[in-house]
């Protein structure tokens, strides 16, 4: 389950107040924890987003861009001293307790691509899911063209294979020809410049005659071991994060000026464990502890008739992928 499951129970006096998650009141023995986890999966199994059967006549077409970022948690943002970066105030909705439920890339992408159903066990990520669970398939049924974009080659850890086989994303990989390489991965593979990739996305959807599209974009500029070409030492995390946040912020400003109708959803995969915690040393992600799974997810709407004014709406209660699917379904429904 990973992350802050305990935080899902708040207390009014001495009585636990539960949202949609089983209460946690028994002593933390192995038997009790396993029983709770089993009841959690049973509860999650009943949950799914209901997408409309067809689009309402007055539904506004828009582009959905889901940005899945490797190695970024709130704890990492804090450790890098970037909590007050202007990017964070650029969102309309910000999730302060979003649980990625995993500390590895493949499972994180699968969970996001299957966001329209409740959480499942790690093992079940590698079993087929019902068609209703695949967020991008739900959108395709409503006429959205699917796009797949990577800021890397997708080979490490069979990432692209898992996105296709377990995530159900069959769209062709967006053309990477001629993209500038800003970093090299620890295995020497190219990590493409994010501004260039986002511009390539804009060019691609501008050529597309369908005004409705849904893009899954996975990028890893913050991954441990990335280094600048010609330098063997791992590039400083803060330097890379500052550049990436600056680029995303500038891209948001560009979208605002364009008038294009876009819903951008940012969901990091998991943290980079920049600082250690009581469970494991920095850099280790074997245990999906809350400092790794509490990630800065956010949503920004562009081209709205009445854009959100002021500071972002902060969602402080525990959330995960189903919340993203719900918000996308509501946006689609007009």
Locations of the language-model features?
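Active-site-proximal alpha/beta segments of enzymes that process anionic O-linked groups
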Residues: 3-7, 13-228, 294, 320-321, ...
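Surface-exposed helix-capping loop/turn segments at secondary-structure junctions
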Residues: 253-262, 334
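Catalytic-core regions built around general acid/base machinery
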Residues: 86-87, 135-138, 243, 247-255
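Long, structured stretches of catalytic cores involved in phosphate-ester chemistry, encompassing
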Residues: 240-251, 259, 267-268, 275, ...
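Phosphate/oxyanion-binding loops and surfaces in catalytic or ligand/nucleic-acid-binding neighborhoods
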Residues: 119, 142, 270-277, 304, ...
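Histidine-centered active-site microenvironments of extracellular/periplasmic hydrolases
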Residues: 261, 267-308
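Active-site rim elements
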Residues: 121-126, 185-189, 234-241, 252-253, ...
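Active-site His/acidic residue clusters
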Residues: 157, 201-202, 206-246, 250, ...
């Amino acid at each position: 389950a990973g992350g802050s499951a305990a935080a899902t129970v708040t207390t009014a006096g001495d009585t636990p107040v539960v949202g949609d998650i089983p209460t946690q009141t028994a002593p933390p023995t192995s038997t009790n924890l396993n029983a709770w986890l089993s009841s959690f999966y049973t509860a999650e199994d009943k949950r799914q987003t209901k997408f409309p059967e067809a689009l309402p006549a007055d539904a506004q077409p828009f582009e959905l861009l889901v940005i899945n970022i490797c190695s970024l948690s709130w704890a990492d943002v804090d450790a890098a001293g970037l909590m007050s970066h202007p990017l964070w105030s650029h969102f309309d909705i910000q999730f302060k307790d979003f649980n990625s439920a995993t500390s590895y890339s493949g499972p994180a992408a699968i969970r996001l691509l299957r966001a329209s159903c409740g959480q499942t066990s790690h093992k079940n990520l590698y079993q087929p899911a019902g068609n209703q669970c695949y967020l991008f398939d739900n959108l395709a049924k409503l006429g959205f063209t699917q796009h797949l974009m990577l800021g890397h080659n997708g080979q490490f850890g069979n990432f692209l294979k898992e996105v296709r086989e377990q995530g159900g994303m069959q769209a062709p990989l967006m053309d990477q020809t001629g993209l500038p390489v800003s970093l090299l991965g620890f295995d020497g593979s190219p990590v493409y410049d994010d501004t260039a990739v986002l511009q390539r996305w804009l060019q691609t959807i501008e050529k597309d005659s369908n005004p409705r599209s849904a893009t899954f974009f996975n990028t890893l500029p913050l991954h441990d071991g990335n280094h600048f070409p010609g330098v063997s030492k791992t590039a400083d995390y803060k330097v890379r994060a500052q550049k990436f946040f600056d680029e995303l912020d500038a891209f948001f400003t560009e979208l605002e000026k364009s008038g294009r109708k876009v819903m951008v959803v940012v969901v990091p995969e998991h943290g980079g464990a920049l600082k250690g915690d009581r469970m494991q040393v920095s850099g280790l992600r074997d245990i999906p502890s809350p400092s790794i799974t509490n990630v800065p997810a956010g949503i920004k709407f562009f081209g709205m008739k009445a854009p959100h004014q002021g500071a972002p709406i902060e969602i402080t209660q525990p959330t995960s992928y189903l919340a993203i699917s719900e918000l996308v379904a509501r946006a689609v429904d007009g």
